[in-house]
């Protein structure tokens, strides 16, 4: 009954207006009120402020400033092995595995279309059929900047307007083609591991999606697909990003989907649904390495794993299924 009510709200509530209201409020400087909201948020979601460059909540002028807070340089060590791709975001893996022709796993028993995710771009989809995907959910407590898993040359960016459904276990199980329906920004890179797509997916109250090379992509929400391209290689107009470098951010955030070409990478064996991710830790290895490195994600303290799972609707909504 409770789940049915929650699901009904996804279709009834004015998600766009709620998102605009959240974005407006999060960008306002409200002095003591801003600090109070941040303090309550930190307490409720158990945000670890000791990892941030500015642990004093009074130092943030707006809630958005707090939400995209930078971390200290020493808290996310980067695995520098050239054969290793690293996690692009702090969060929880919601799904990962092989792309079966045009099908990507959304939730148990539910798939969505690769081509639909890529806004009907069948040429781009052909690069990833039978490849590998990873879907990472960023909970409210997480660091909301997104980084590069490997070195990459930006070739294409597509803004796809769409719905603003919440992204959690309940909607993944009940909203068909959830990620292919929600607003998103698709970024295609040339890498040493073949083509890679990194997709930033919006959701309810995601006020803004930004990239480091173009700034704010959305809003405004004009309801049309937009496409930009960049040259390859050493061209002076090309955009080159290094492994571990920031590539984008959410202001009130959501989900990152990575797509890799077939036969190019192997995911770290210990990773699974609901694995906690930290930027810079091993995500995958190259299939073309001369010596396969033996790598595992750095073990996290049990209390940190519990806090991450407790903050994630991917876990919380399962409690309501009975």
Curated annotation (Swiss-Prot):
Subcellular location, principal: membrane
Subunit record text: Heterodimer of a large membrane-associated beta subunit and a small pyruvoyl-containing alpha subunit.
GO terms classed as biological process: phosphatidylethanolamine biosynthetic process
NCBIfam families, sorted: PS_decarb (TIGR00163)
Region (Disordered): 294-322
UniProt record similarity statement: Belongs to the phosphatidylserine decarboxylase family. PSD-B subfamily. Prokaryotic type I sub-subfamily.
Pathway: Phospholipid metabolism; phosphatidylethanolamine biosynthesis; phosphatidylethanolamine from CDP-diacylglycerol: step 2/2
Enzyme Commission number, as recorded: 4.1.1.65
The name this protein goes by in its record: Phosphatidylserine decarboxylase proenzyme
Entry PTM: Is synthesized initially as an inactive proenzyme. Formation of the active enzyme involves a self-maturation process in which the active site pyruvoyl group is generated from an internal serine residue via an autocatalytic post-translational modification. Two non-identical subunits are generated from the proenzyme in this reaction, and the pyruvate is formed at the N-terminus of the alpha chain, which is derived from the carboxyl end of the proenzyme.
Membrane topology: Peripheral membrane protein
Cellular component terms (Gene Ontology): plasma membrane
Gene name linked to the record: psd
Cofactor, free-text remark: Binds 1 pyruvoyl group covalently per subunit.
Protein localization: Cell membrane
């Amino acid at each position: 009954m409770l789940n049915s009510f929650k699901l009904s709200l996804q279709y009834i509530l004015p998600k766009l207006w709620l998102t605009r209201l959240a974005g407006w409020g999060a960008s306002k400087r409200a002095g003591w009120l801003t600090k109070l909201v941040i303090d309550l948020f930190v307490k409720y979601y158990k945000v670890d402020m000791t990892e941030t460059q500015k642990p004093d909540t009074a130092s943030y002028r707006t809630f958005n400033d707090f939400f995209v807070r930078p971390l200290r340089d020493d808290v996310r060590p980067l695995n520098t092995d050239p054969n290793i791709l690293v996690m692009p975001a702090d969060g929880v893996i919601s799904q990962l595995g092989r792309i079966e022709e045009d099908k990507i796993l959304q939730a148990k028993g539910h798939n969505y279309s690769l081509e639909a995710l890529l806004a009907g771009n069948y040429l781009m989809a052909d690069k990833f059929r039978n490849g590998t995907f990873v879907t990472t959910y960023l909970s409210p407590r997480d660091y909301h900047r997104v980084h590069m898993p490997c070195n990459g040359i930006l070739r294409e960016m597509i803004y796809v307007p769409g719905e603003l459904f919440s992204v959690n276990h309940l909607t993944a199980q009940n909203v068909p083609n959830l990620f292919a329906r929600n607003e998103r920004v698709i970024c295609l890179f040339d890498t040493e591991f073949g083509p890679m797509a990194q997709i930033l997916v919006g959701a309810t109250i995601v006020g803004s999606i930004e990239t480091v090379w173009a700034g704010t992509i959305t809003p405004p929400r004009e309801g049309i697909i937009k496409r930009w391209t960049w040259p390859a290689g050493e061209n002076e107009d090309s955009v080159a990003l290094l492994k571990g470098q920031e590539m984008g951010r959410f202001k009130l955030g959501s989900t990152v989907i990575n797509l890799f070409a077939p036969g190019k990478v192997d995911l770290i064996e210990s990773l699974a649904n609901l694995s906690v991710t930290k930027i810079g830790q091993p995500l995958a290895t190259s299939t073309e390495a001369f010596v396969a490195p033996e790598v595992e994600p750095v073990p996290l303290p049990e209390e940190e794993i519990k806090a991450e799972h407790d903050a994630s609707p991917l876990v919380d909504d399962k409690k309501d299924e009975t």
